[in-house]
Amino acid sequence: MRTRNQKLIVIGGVAVIVVLALLALVPLFISLVSHPGVKTDGIDADGAKAASTDVDGEWVVTTKPGKNMTSAGFTFYELLPGDERTTSGSTQDVEGEMTIEGGSLTAGKVTVNMGNIVTDKDVRDENVRRKILHTEEYPESTFVLTEPADVSQLPEDGTAGTVTLTGDLTIHGKPNSITQEFNALRTGDNVIVHADVPINRLDYGVETPEFVAAKIAEDGEINIRLKLEKKS
């Protein structure tokens, strides 16, 4: 009887230790996922100059550092026990080209390297790449223009305007047609465009594993800001 009681005490003690260890990991996990991350912000038109080049021509995405530099990424809500917080990730690893003829945007493609998107937590970045976005299998996301867009009315005086673009957005290997209004700014030799594109991750086949302490909301945003210059 004594031996049996001793075994029960040992088993009970081990169970308590395991439970306490798991409880101790919960705040650690929350701290890893609950930071706001790194978001791609909108256009900063402060100090913008009048356009110094014609809008027609071949334009390419530039990744030169500085104000309104090219960036793309995501923003989603993380659903924590009793709380809801936003988390963003971004990258400057973006390529793209656009063609404007007679004041009409006739062709355009933008490619984002998903494997280089970062938040502000290395552990979270690794989990997002491997377990959510599966970047080894789907390393790129793209937007391809499918309808011409009138850009002839964009202001030339260094103030921002808007342009509506329609195209195929492909994430996780799955394309969806979207129509989105972009803010656009002609300043000096550059054109800057920005939008926060609402998406439902399930439309792109992006599932999330069953996290212990947090889940990711279905609805979120693709944040994109492109700095374009004339093709040399």
Provide a role label for each language-model segment.
Residues 2-232:
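Low-complexity, acidic/polar, glycine-enriched regions of mature
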